[in-house]
Amino acid sequence: MGKPMTASPQGKSFRQSPPPSRVEKAELGPGLYLTATPIGHARDITLRALDVLQGCDLIAAEDTRVTAKLLAIYGFAKPLTPYNDHNGERERPRLLAKLRAGARIALVSDAGTPLVSDPGFKLARAALAEDLPVHAVPGASAMLTGLMLSALPSDRFLFAGFLPPKGGERRTALEALKAVPATLIFYETGPRLAATLADMVAVLGGARASVVARELTKLHEEVRRASLAELAAHYADAEPPKGEITLLVGGPAGKTADLEQLDRLLDQALPFMPVRAAADLLADALSLPRKLVYGHALARKDRQDD
């Protein structure tokens, strides 16, 4: 299709000038740039992330070898320094000193969004505590990619990161999450996956809809959807899977449906009843905690008043 034509005052036609670019490369100012990188497919990087990685003075990386390979794919190199759980206490003061001096530092994890199950949050928190500039450069996330592919409810979800490696502590953590009326999202390692699924069946029950997603956006991506019991049985007899794993578990049976029903009934009741009265009535009718119902009622009332 050709470019649109516009009539000139003399009746002749001419081609419109292209509109000014709305994605012009901005000059990189000082500060800490929390920069997301791909979780697998190298093209899943943003233009802004490339601008930051090319324009910064230093990249603080969870593993400098991994980040160096990533930069080589895009055809450039930058000074790298390791920043991880092992050296964070030692490196943080040095990086903060550079930020105070006006340096432009990009913080990256090995894959995905930094600060999500990642050691970088202490550096970001320390920089913010000193009123140093901190910028988010959003992008890929295994947690959200897994949720997108899971077919589980996405209106309410809770990211719980890695569960404890020891069985007793892991089961205690799962007990605390048992009644959460939302999709639960975890990261897990291949060697621990079978034991984690077995503990989930024991604590959460085997009927919950669940998903094991691994190697997301990579060549050997696998998304396995089944009940917790079926997944536990499969991985109990299988070799430990390789690659990064995102584990998703549906909320407790009935709870999500109860909350959806609660919101519908609140929308009907609040135009005619005070918030407290509507909350008390529906908490009794649906056998839900009064505090939870009152919180929903306040939120629905605010939405109606907007």
Q: Which positions does each model-derived feature cover?
A:
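Glycine-rich, flexible N-terminal cofactor/catalytic loop recognition
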Residues: 2-85
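A contiguous loop/helix-start segment that scaffolds small-molecule binding in enzyme catalytic cores
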Residues: 2-17, 21, 29, 104, ...
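Generic beta-sheet signal
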Residues: 31-35, 102-109, 157, 182-186, ...
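Short active-site oxyanion
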Residues: 52-59, 131-135, 183-184
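General beta-strand structural signal in soluble alpha/beta enzymes
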Residues: 61, 134-139, 186, 212
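Conserved helicase motor
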Residues: 82-90, 163-166
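A glycine-rich beta-strand to alpha-helix segment
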Residues: 99-145, 191-195, 277
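Class I SAM-dependent methyltransferase SAM-binding "motif I" and its flanking Rossmann-like core
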Residues: 122-180
